[in-house]
């Protein structure tokens, strides 16, 4: 789950690059992207490796940022409507990802095969999972509470 959150947050942070036109906003995007990657490395692998990677990223970003600022003329930084809309939609997506119920979902997809096998006599994976069915469509996981309607629709389509 943490890998999925990292990917969504990195995609949302780096999508701001498309509308960032000034070096200050580009530097902030690079810095926040490196911070997200370093936190993920620190959580998944090692805190020491994450810290060293963070120091490397921050030093590189600071040198690049200061170089670009010395070349680029100073301008007033203003938020435009596109920027506000993208940031608010990214925050909303992150909030929705945090609210998802992962109790009946496995990333490996084995529960999906169990759902399709219920009509063939395969035992459900979880004790009370006969009420739930999972369908994975283009990376979005849907949990259906009415298993009989889901099974009937699958049997009629095949």
Curated annotation (Swiss-Prot):
Transmembrane segments: 1-21, 48-68, 79-99
Source taxon at top rank: Eukaryota
Membrane topology annotation: Multi-pass membrane protein
Subcellular localization, as worded in the UniProt entry: Mitochondrion membrane
GO cellular component: a single term: mitochondrial membrane
Listed EC numbers: 7.1.1.2
N-terminal signal peptide: none
Reactions catalysed according to its record: a ubiquinone + NADH + 5 H(+)(in) = a ubiquinol + NAD(+) + 4 H(+)(out)
GO terms for MF: NADH dehydrogenase (ubiquinone) activity
This protein's record includes keyword Thylakoid: no
Uppermost EC category: translocase
Keyword field: Electron transport, Membrane, Mitochondrion, NAD, Respiratory chain, Translocase, Transmembrane, Transmembrane helix, Transport, Ubiquinone
Family: Belongs to the complex I subunit 6 family.
Function: Core subunit of the mitochondrial membrane respiratory chain NADH dehydrogenase (Complex I) that is believed to belong to the minimal assembly required for catalysis. Complex I functions in the transfer of electrons from NADH to the respiratory chain. The immediate electron acceptor for the enzyme is believed to be ubiquinone.
Protein's UniProt name: NADH-ubiquinone oxidoreductase chain 6
This protein's encoding gene: ND6
């Amino acid at each position: 789950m943490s890998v999925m959150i990292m990917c969504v947050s990195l995609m949302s942070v780096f999508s701001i690059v498309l509308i960032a036109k000034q070096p200050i906003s580009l530097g902030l995007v690079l810095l926040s992207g490196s911070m997200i990657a370093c936190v993920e490395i620190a959580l998944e692998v090692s805190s020491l490796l994450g810290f060293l990677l963070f120091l490397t990223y921050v030093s590189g970003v600071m040198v690049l940022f200061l170089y670009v600022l010395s070349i680029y003329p100073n301008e007033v930084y203003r938020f435009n409507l596109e920027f506000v809309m993208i940031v608010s939609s990214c925050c909303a997506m992150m909030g929705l990802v945090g609210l998802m119920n992962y109790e009946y979902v496995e990333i490996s997809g084995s529960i999906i095969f169990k759902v399709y096998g219920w009509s063939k006599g395969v035992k459900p994976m979880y004790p009370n999972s006969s009420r739930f069915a999972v369908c994975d469509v283009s990376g979005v996981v849907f949990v259906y509470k009415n298993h009989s309607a889901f099974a009937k629709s699958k049997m009629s389509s095949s």
